[in-house]
Amino acid sequence: MREYKVVVLGSGGVGKSALTVQFVTGTFIEKYDPTIEDFYRKEIEVDSSPSVLEILDTAGTEQFASMRDLYIKNGQGFILVYSLVNQQSFQDIKPMRDQIVRVKRYEKVPLILVGNKVDLEPEREVMSSEGRALAQEWGCPFMETSAKSKSMVDELFAEIVRQMNYSSLPEKQDQCCTTCVVQ
């Protein structure tokens, strides 16, 4: 059984813990309690292949931002979460993705951009088109979720497994002869 380390990143109050706990336990956390760091494990079957996810739910507040490099260094897949009802949280996600690329030294890191709190549609500040455009720029999937109504939560974690599976496939080598002569 394959094991994957997934890191959930985003600003404070965007619903990182709510999404993670909803996925792992099937319950919604009503009360906001800022996270420093929480760790979860869950078995998941994606495309008939069993896997174990080790999910690191990180602090969203800036006072713990210095810990992010370590989380990123150890992570294999990343879920970047912003709140659909908070434009600033959408802006905050961009430097986090830049940090992932800097630490990993690789552009094609398994990553999903997530707009959370779709259940609060009347209060929306970030349009779906903005999320889609940013995901397209980054070359990653985009999803809108609701931890409260459990909308797209299981699909989100299944998709990050697919992304990690896809990135671990060996890249096709160029067709070339095995001997080269330089004169």
Swiss-Prot record:
It is an enzyme of class 3 (hydrolase). Its EC number is 3.6.5.2. Coiled coil: none annotated. A lipid is attached at residue 180 (S-geranylgeranyl cysteine). Residues 181-183 form a propeptide. It catalyses: GTP + H2O = GDP + phosphate + H(+). Belongs to the small GTPase superfamily. Ras family. Small GTP-binding protein which cycles between a GDP-bound inactive and a GTP-bound active form. May play a role in cytoskeletal rearrangements and regulate cell spreading through activation of the effector TNIK. May play a role in SRE-mediated gene transcription. This is Ras-related protein Rap-2c. It comes from Homo sapiens (Human). The gene is RAP2C.
